[in-house]
A protein has these predicted regions:
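Short, glycine/acidic-enriched loop or turn micro-motifs at the edges of active sites
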Residues: 49-50, 80, 170, 244
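Active-site neighborhood of phospho(di)ester-bond hydrolases with catalytic His/Asp-centered motifs
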Residues: 45-47, 69-78, 100-104, 163-166, ...
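Conserved beta-strand hairpin/beta-sheet module of binuclear metal-dependent hydrolase folds
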Residues: 3-63, 154-157, 161-165
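Binuclear metal-ion centers of metallo-dependent hydrolases, dominated by the metallo-beta-lactamase
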Residues: 233-270
Length: 270
């Protein structure tokens, strides 16, 4: 049984925030779009790939949101695993005023997912002062350049202290039993990640190290992103891949770990 069969329903992450993701069959990449519900309206963050579209939409309906009430689609960078379904989403939302929000730099590439007559729907978060407010709920956008695209950013919901971190804090793998992170007490001081002292097959710390070494371009970009994230008081980190971090101890641990991770991208090759 794969994970999408195990968790075939939306999962509440924080007040008004729902995981509406699925497991990409045939890969280990577990994609996590998130729906933020404010009164009877909603915002979708990193909406998912084309092949995820039907499953994501099913979960949005299960939350009780009519697609017509989605007012904004936020894309924290331009990769196909989060942007692939943008055209399908615009079609099904049938909202002529829907906004597709991203950075000026990422907009260049996101436009390639759309027909020309829809380019006007893409708006720059910079033009909103790096914030977006829906019925008094304000999301703040924090630039994390080159982590991993030039226009990458993360999104902070002050009301629930949730950080939507896109590829940051992601993993290629995930706990199969649960979408939430579950680090054992002895893991924080473990020095033999390649060979788990407890005999477990999956090491979530190693998985996160490997993901960032592969996906991020260099140490400087990753360390800078962590220095910006460290300034924020966060209760939950909701990444686009892997598991959701919800314990302060785990959040601090991984901010510090990724903030000094070596052999990242080109730095691990030269
Ligand atoms: Fe990406
Ligand atoms: Fe991704």
């Amino acid at each position: 049984m794969n994970n999408s069969e195990k968790i075939d329903f939306p999962v509440q992450v924080a007040e008004g925030i729902y995981w509406v993701g699925s497991h990409e069959q045939g890969t280990h990449l577990y994609c996590n779009p998130y729906l933020i519900v404010v009164d009877d309206k909603a915002i979708l963050i990193d909406g998912g790939s084309r092949s995820d579209f039907a499953r994501v939409m099913m979960k949005i309906l299960q939350v009780g949101i009519d697609p017509k009430d989605i007012v904004a689609l936020i894309y924290q960078h331009y990769d196909p695993d989060l942007c692939g379904s943008v055209s399908n989403l615009i079609d099904i939302c049938e909202n002529p005023d829907i906004k597709v929000l991203s950075t000026r730099d990422d907009k260049t590439f996101i436009s390639f997912y759309l027909q020309k007559n829809r380019f006007r729907l893409i708006e720059n978060i910079e033009d909103y002062g790096n914030t977006f407010t829906l019925n008094k709920r304000t999301l703040r956008f924090i630039p994390t350049p080159y982590a991993h695209t030039n226009g990458s950013f993360v999104t902070f919901d002050a009301q629930t202290k949730t950080l939507f971190s896109s590829d940051l804090f992601g993993s290629f793998s995930y706990y199969k039993e649960n979408i939430f992170f579950d680090l054992a007490p002895q893991c924080y001081t473990c020095t033999t990640l390649e060979k788990c002292p407890d005999g477990k097959e999956y090491c979530p710390i190693l998985a996160m190290d490997q993901f960032h070494r592969k996906i991020m371009p260099c140490e400087k970009a990753l360390h800078y992103a962590m220095s910006q994230i460290k300034k924020i008081e966060i209760d939950t980190i909701a990444p686009q891949h892997g598991n959701i971090l919800y314990r302060r101890k785990d959040i601090d641990f991984f901010i510090d770990r990724l903030g000094s991770l070596d052999k990242v991208g080109i730095d691990g090759m030269l």
